[in-house]
Amino acid sequence: MWQFWIDRGGTFTDIVARKPDGTILIDKLLSENVSMYKDAAIAGIKRILNLKNEDKIPTDKIASVKMGTTVATNALLERKGDRTLLLITKGFGDLLRIGYQNRPLLFDLNIQLPELLYDRVVEVSERLDAQGKIVKKLDENQVKIALKKAKNDGINSVAIAFMHSYINPDHENVIAKIAENENFDQISVSHKVSPLIKLVGRGDTTVVDAYLSPILRRYVNQVSEELEEDKSTKLMFMQSNGGLTDANLFQGKDALLSGPAGGVVSMVQTGKQAGYGKLIGFDMGGTSTDVCHFAGEYERSFETELAGVRIRAPMMQINTVAAGGGSILSFKAVSYTHLRAHE
């Protein structure tokens, strides 16, 4: 049966296919070309199989499709995620803005705070103690009013992060049910996204998940719809930690380095075959550039900062910047002003 490996970048999509007889085929096409096709990955598969755009993919002849994608990465770098509402314990509304109070430039008087991903924050009247016992009962009516207002204002994604909810998730579960009844498209709860102590890391990661999961889910659904005729084709996505997961389990918090992580695994395997055990990887795409290091074993981090955003999730140790082959360097008068990814 056919097998496909696809790297969907911000500018180009690369496809490697193996025919049933073992022959390897490769193809490359633009990730965005609305006049020619809806999705580059599906278009590439059809092109390799000599199908027309309107033809259905014979999924009974395809064993698996394994993908890495920078959809979430580029959405974060370019701040194109979904509008998000943050619900947090009363008294902690500014917690994620304050963060850990890190100041890279200690004596700089003009402090540049990182851009927040959430549009709005609501402090919820509720409180648990460190053992998970209720100190203050949840005010459900307050939450219902806040959620209705956010929904009416066009916000469709909600992040819920309460104090000590990793011990007792009852309050978060109640809020999640209310948000579900209000038909929010994405509901991220901290005790599921990052069930660990420390509200800053848990809250940051939950917001990232709520911000990116909708755009990621739309893309995954777009691909899976073309491959679900008889459900015989296995669709899997590369996670930031370098492992593959089923398409239905692919989350925003695990997708930030989906594409780059696949590059690290490929670099290491290629390097080993060539007899090298120490490697530095430089991966420049059209939208972003990734740099990584290997000295005998994969380097991973659990808490990291990407594009000015803190996140607590296992991922490959990769440094990413929003500057690629298609980036635009602006020039005014006698100085270069800024470099940004193309739109």
Locate each region found by the language model.
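A short acidic Gly-Thr/Ser loop motif
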Residues: D7-G10, T69-T70, T89, P260, ...
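Short beta-strand segments
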Residues: G68, L85-T89, E123-S125, A161, ...
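Glycine/threonine-rich beta-strand-loop-alpha-helix active-site module
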Residues: R97-Q101, L105-L106, K278-G281, S288-K332
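Glycine-rich phosphate-binding loops at beta-strand->alpha-helix junctions
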Residues: A161-H171
